[in-house]
């Protein structure tokens, strides 16, 4: 049963990749530039890729429509808004059933402190990224939020000392 869950996920990813058009060099440059500064106007973006604004606008809209650009968002400084602690938390579920996996994925969607969640292979089932104000607030979060999720079997917290790199983008070959 566990194998069929992974098989379905992999097949879904392959289908997603097949349903997109290929990127040319200009599309790639647009994506790279927008990952660094999505606040650019179409005119500024066009100047950087050496095209007129109209075709750049059309390309950008196509990249959005086809899902290459998922969304635009502001990157907020966690420390300035009072979240001084970043924790990477490995989670192991009690059992590997489709119902428990789905239950966990559904529950984390409603927890604001969890900013990222990855279904992983290896010793743990999920890796979550959690922001907290301080150690005491993380302890309360762990006990009162994560501790109440029935499908969690165990967890392992890793406290980030310093962020040495975070481009918040993906490589565009």
What are these regions (language model features)?
Residues 1-173:
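A compositional/biophysical signature of low hydrophobicity enriched in polar/charged and small residues
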């Amino acid at each position: 049963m566990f194998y069929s869950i992974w098989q379905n996920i992999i097949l879904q990813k392959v289908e997603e990749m097949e349903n997109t058009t290929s990127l040319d060099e200009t599309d790639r440059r647009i994506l790279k530039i927008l990952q660094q500064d999505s606040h650019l106007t179409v005119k500024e973006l066009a100047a950087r890729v050496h095209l007129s604004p109209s075709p750049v606008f059309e390309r950008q809209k196509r990249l959005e429509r086809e899902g290459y650009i998922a969304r635009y968002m502001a990157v907020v400084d966690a420390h300035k808004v009072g979240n001084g602690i970043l924790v990477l938390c490995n989670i192991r579920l009690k059992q590997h059933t489709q119902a428990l996996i789905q239950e966990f994925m559904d529950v984390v969607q409603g927890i604001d402190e969890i900013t990222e969640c990855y279904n992983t292979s290896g010793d743990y089932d999920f890796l979550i990224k959690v922001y907290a104000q301080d150690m005491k607030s993380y302890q309360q979060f762990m006990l009162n939020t994560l501790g109440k999720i029935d499908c969690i079997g165990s967890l392992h917290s890793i406290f980030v000392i310093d962020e040495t790199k975070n481009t918040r983008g993906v490589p565009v070959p």
